[in-house]
Amino acid sequence: MGSDDLSAGDKIQKGFQINNMILRDADSGKIIWQENKDFSAPDVEHEARVPIKILDMRAVSREINFSTIESMENFRLDQKVLFKGRIMEEWFFEMGFVGANTTNTWQSTIEAAPESQMMPAKVLNGNVTIQTSFYDNETLITKSVVRLYYI
């Protein structure tokens, strides 16, 4: 099967890789978690062990460093936070144009839910998954699932 036989999404996915992810306290800028791992692989459930103190932060800054061989007209992602398979939160982020053969860092700020809506870490631990779908316009590139453990 040649590259001409791949769908647009498959072609982008083949050359797409997450190099690392960093979570920072949005107020202080201090790194609270970092992982040099490609979380974009669609056929596995990834795991992340994040410090429990993340649940007490007002906002978290997320940096995704990624590389792509193909250009993308409108790189965006949809992210769902699920508790035992049920959607708790959903966010939509848009980066825009990404050039071919580039490495990029995308930073987004995520604000915490109101304290009255927060659940204790012992309830959340291992029961929360983050499902991230990466798109170029409406073309699905890959879908990643990460299960969270609080340490």
Swiss-Prot record:
Identify the main location. nucleus
The source organism is Drosophila willistoni (Fruit fly)
Gene Ontology CC terms, in alphabetical order: cytoplasm; nucleus
Q: Which UniProt keywords apply?
A: cGMP, Cytoplasm, Nucleus
Its subcellular locations are: Nucleus; Cytoplasm
Q: What is stated as this protein's family in its record? A: Belongs to the PDE6D/unc-119 family.
PANTHER family reported for this sequence? RETINAL ROD RHODOPSIN-SENSITIVE CGMP 3',5'-CYCLIC PHOSPHODIESTERASE DELTA-SUBUNIT, RETINAL ROD RHODOPSIN-SENSITIVE CGMP 3',5'-CYCLIC PHOSPHODIESTERASE SUBUNIT DELTA
The primary gene name is PrBP
The protein here is known as: Probable cGMP 3',5'-cyclic phosphodiesterase subunit delta
